[in-house]
Each structure stands twice: as structure tokens, then as C-alpha cells.
Swiss-Prot record:
Membrane topology, record value: Peripheral membrane protein
Any GO CC annotation of this UniProt entry: cytoplasmic side of plasma membrane
Keyword Membrane in annotation: yes
A Pfam family annotated for this UniProt entry: Syd
InterPro entries noted in UniProt: Syd, Syd_sf
Biological role: Interacts with the SecY protein in vivo. May bind preferentially to an uncomplexed state of SecY, thus functioning either as a chelating agent for excess SecY in the cell or as a regulatory factor that negatively controls the translocase function.
Family membership noted in the UniProt record: Belongs to the Syd family.
Subcellular location field: Cell inner membrane
Annotated signal sequence range: none
Protein name: Protein Syd
Source organism of this protein record: Shewanella baltica (strain OS155 / ATCC BAA-1091)
Lineage of the organism: Bacteria, Pseudomonadati, Pseudomonadota, Gammaproteobacteria, Alteromonadales
Amino acid sequence: MSCLPALDKFLQNYHQAYLTSLGELPRYYPQGEPSVCIQGEFHADLDQAVSWQPVKREVEGSFANVEHALELTLWPEINHFYGQYFSAPLLFDSEWGTGELLQVWNEDDFTCLQQNLIGHLMMKKKLKQPPTWFIGLLDEGDKMLTINNSDGSVWIELPGEIPTQQLSPSLAEFIGALSPRIAPPVKHEELPMPALEHPGIFASFKRMWQNLFGKR
């Protein structure tokens, strides 16, 4: 079962929750990055939050280059989850805690996603672990949410470790169990990680790595 209907519904509920509770669209710090998602004026040189809404992509994002580079067939849900919309990260509440689903802010963000996905999968191969790919963060970035590439199930994963806790048998069921979380926009400080420079998707992963390794 495709996760796209569940993602469509969550996006609709997400924006309706903000409109109902706050009377406004959700806001996000783009850190100078343009996007078709931005509603209203945008000034790249001003450090301010923008109102946004998801925009359906005219051409679906493709991961064929990633599959070719790694000689690996990816679980097809990756195209539905990351290739259908431009969107800011989506905050959620769940029975497993609070977190966020990663999404793609613009085409540059999509390129960064592909590059970092390749890096993640190469690391899994080097560690002789089954391939996974990430969809979000849990518990303020302390844990990754990943997909088992062999069957599409959703797991909690710590970098460098094999996932041990399954959350859902499918991405569609997982998204269906989430509730939108209403919160003010948070500006995330840039960390010195050159490989993850783009402020869209991987600002979230910068926080995760800082939280994980800053505690050791």
C-alpha cells in the first residue's frame, strides 16, 4: 500500500491544525533558501521565518541515480515520500514521542538528500548491516526514523547501529498514526559539518549528530 494517501492526508491535517489553532499557516526558517512553498514576501538576506504550504511537484523526484550509483534497488515508497512534494519538515506527536518527518524544501535540498542518502547507505554497507533509508527524527533528534529497504517497515535507528525497535510494518500505517504538532518556528544554529551544509532537510540531521555525539 502506497504511503502517498496517508502523506496527502497528514499534510492537509497539518495545515488545518495551524489555521484552526493559530489562524495562520505554519512558519519555517529557510535560512536564505528560496522555495515555491513560501507564501508572501521572501528576502534571502533577512534572517526571518516565512509562512509556507506544501506544493505538489510537477515532475516526481527520482532516485534512479542513487540506485545506479549503489547498484541497489530502493524500496519504492522513497519516491512517494520524498518525490511528490516540496515542503518544510513536518512536526508530529505520536505514541513513540515527538519528532519530525523530513521533506524537501527545493531542488537543491533534493540533491543534498540524494547525496546524504548515498553516504548513509555506503556506511551501512561498510558496517555489513542491512540497508535502510531515513525519513525523520524522533525525540528532539536523538534518534533516526528509518525504513527497512527489504520490506518497507519503519524502525528507530541510531547512527552506526542496527535498528532494534520496529514501529510499524509500513510507512503508510506509520504516517497514519501521527498527529500534527503545533509549535513556533525554531531557528537552528549551523554546525561545522561541511558535508551537510544545506539548511533544509539536513539542518535536522545536524542537530541529531550534535545531540548524539555531543553527549559522549
